[in-house]
Amino acid sequence: MWYYNDEPYEIALGEYQGFVYCITELTTNKMYIGKKGFWSKKTLPPLKGKTRKRRSVVESDWMKYYGSSEVVKQLLLEHGADNFRRDILYLCKSKAEMGYLEAKEQFDRNVLLDDRYYNGIINCKVHRNHIKGLHSNHNSI
């Protein structure tokens, strides 16, 4: 179950591309900060008599997602999903917004130096023009 503003969140809204999240291991309170898209592109075979492959946008596996961290994935296998809480920090309208807010949250929380986090890397490339509509009123919960 994902939570947003402490309420269960189950619907991928069309206006949003994805979200920035915090996954917390409940026994140790260690966390992982990441991002996940609501949508993914799927390549379909060409229509009969055509040669060009088709692209389709489908809902991603976000409901079942527990992050890209190998450590978190292993803990999930060992202890089960009930040992984790998944919180959505920001709903994002673009991939650039997701990338920017994920990196901002990771730097603000000092995830690479603070032992309370599983994050092992901060990887981000965002161009200023891609986030012009983003204002500094994004506050994490």
Which stretches of residues belong to each language-model region?
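Structure-specific nucleic-acid interaction/processing domains
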Residues: 1-141
